[in-house]
A protein has these predicted regions:
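Short, Lys/Arg- and Gly-enriched loop/turn segments at beta-strand edges
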Residues: 127-137
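Low-complexity, Lys/Gly-biased intrinsically disordered segments
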Residues: 41-91, 107-109, 126-127
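Short coil/turn segments at secondary-structure boundaries
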Residues: 65-73, 98, 183-185, 255-256
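Loop/turn positions that initiate beta-strands
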Residues: 116-117
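Basic, amphipathic alpha-helical recognition segments used for DNA target recognition
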Residues: 1, 52-59, 88-95, 142-204
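Short, surface-exposed secondary-structure edge patches
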Residues: 108-113, 127, 142-145
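Non-catalytic DNA-recognition/assembly elements of restriction-modification systems
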Residues: 1-67, 201, 208-259
Length: 259
């Protein structure tokens, strides 16, 4: 459906698809002209491209594990931190302020253990107003136990002879922000799922390593600066409230603070 420019009424978007264009899916969203145009722009890039599946050396699905509250530990399992969808920040990267702990089978924990440079993909989740497919880059892991990831996520290891993980991260993050993942998802029982076969067919523009580093560092630095400004703005806004109440004789410090 497409929004009319004149009002908020949904009006049908009509277009045609040649039979030889059809692949293994009949979802009309996948064949929308705007998506075809986006694919063409990427494919015709002068720098050259390769498919995402050719840019990685490994991809593995996650594991949710067992709840420590009602699981009886045994030597085959170990307590791990488990990164999940809620640890993804929509505008930045991973947020480790609330990381779950679960028992994971040791044989699986070894395969799933995250390390610096790994990329996580949100393959299931989303919301009515948010597509699935958010991207995260594993950097520092400030934990005293192994860190794995849930079954709603997928881990990729980048072929570092071809690409910098930081570049793949900012590239896929940019595609997510412009709505690319909208076209390669489907929905069942309220949960959106990323079509991984289509995801790994994403064309990755392949500049030189020097250019990859330049692009990645600039993007990451800019997002860090934006995050800092956001935190500063929150502090300023809170100080305004404190000032106003203070001028009115309402002291929120010490015993007079509510809650």
């Amino acid at each position: 459906m497409k929004k009319s420019n004149r009002n908020s009424i949904d009006t049908p978007e009509t277009f045609f698809v040649w039979s030889n264009e059809l692949q293994d899916r009949f979802d009309p969203f996948f064949y929308r002209p705007v998506f075809k145009k986006l694919l063409a722009v990427i494919a015709n890039n002068k720098t050259g491209t390769i498919h995402l599946k050719e840019a990685i050396i490994n991809s593995v699905a996650g594991e949710w594990g067992e709840d420590p509250i009602d699981f009886e530990p045994n030597p085959d399992y170990e307590l791990c931190y488990v990164v999940r969808n809620t640890n993804f920040h929509n505008d930045f990267n991973l947020d480790f302020s609330d990381v779950a702990q679960r028992y994971i089978k040791k044989s699986k924990a070894e395969k799933l253990a995250l390390k610096k440079g790994d990329i996580l993909i949100e393959k299931s989740g989303g919301s009515p107003i948010q597509p699935v497919g958010r991207i995260a880059l594993v950097d520092d892991l400030p934990f005293d136990k192994p860190v794995v990831f849930s079954n709603f996520l997928q881990k990729m290891e980048v072929n570092k002879e071809l690409f910098l993980p930081e570049y793949i991260f900012v590239y896929l993050q940019a595609l997510y922000k412009i709505g690319y993942m909208d076209f390669i998802q489907n929905q069942t029982t309220g949960i959106k799922n990323l079509r991984l076969d289509d995801f790994f067919k994403i064309l990755i523009i392949k500049p030189s390593m020097a250019e990859q580093k330049k692009v990645a560092l600039k993007a990451i630095k800019s997002r860090e600066e934006a995050k800092g400004l956001l935190e500063k703005a929150k502090t300023i806004l809170a100080s305004i409230d404190t000032f106003v109440l203070g001028e009115l004789g309402i002291d929120l410090s010490g015993e007079n603070r509510a809650g």
